[in-house]
């Protein structure tokens, strides 16, 4: 009988943890990296204009106060997120852009409510599509910067996606 009681308690704890994950509201901010300095390098740094844009991101998105930062493993994506992460005293976690579902799963399981994710012209729109489970967004032109997707999750589903310039 005592064992049955412990099993019941354990089941309730697991069940309540699962419910919490799916009832949380989350805000996922998706940003393509800022302008890069040298398009001939495989891993270019940000240009002076890109560095200014990365600094502006802090002001534009300050009210969202991300609790977690994710970036692909490239200088330009990390350096786009860095001013904001530094201001919030957070580290930037690396994710594999070829595996968007792994990132989405980690976000959905996390207790964190607000995320900033930096990626590329051909990965950020795909991540927005994967989150919304719809093919709404096409890859950005290589010269297109300054677009922010704000994805709001409610009860485990996309509630809305806002697109903002910056």
Model-derived regions, located:
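Short beta-strand segments
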Residues: 118-119
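Active-site-proximal alpha-helix that buttresses catalytic centers in soluble enzyme cores
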Residues: 24-111, 124-127, 134-148, 153-166
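Compact alpha-helical subdomains of small soluble proteins
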Residues: 114-115
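Bacterial Sec-dependent N-terminal signal peptides
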Residues: 1-25
């Amino acid at each position: 009988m005592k064992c049955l009681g412990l099993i019941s308690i354990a089941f309730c704890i697991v069940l309540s943890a699962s419910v919490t994950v799916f009832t949380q509201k989350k805000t996922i901010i998706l940003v393509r990296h800022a302008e890069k300095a040298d398009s001939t390098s495989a891993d270019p740094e940000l240009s002076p204009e890109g560095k200014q844009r990365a600094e502006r991101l802090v002001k534009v998105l300050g009210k969202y106060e991300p609790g977690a930062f994710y970036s692909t493993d490239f200088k330009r994506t990390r350096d786009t997120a860095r001013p904001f992460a530094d201001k919030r005293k957070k580290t930037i976690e690396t994710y594999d852009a070829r595996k968007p579902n792994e990132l989405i799963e980690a976000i959905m399981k996390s207790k964190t409510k607000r995320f900033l994710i930096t990626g590329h012209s051909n990965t950020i729109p795909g991540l927005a599509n994967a989150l919304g489970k719809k093919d709404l967004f096409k890859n950005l032109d290589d010269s297109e910067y300054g677009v922010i997707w704000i994805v709001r999750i409610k009860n485990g589903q996309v509630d809305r996606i806002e697109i903002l310039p910056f």
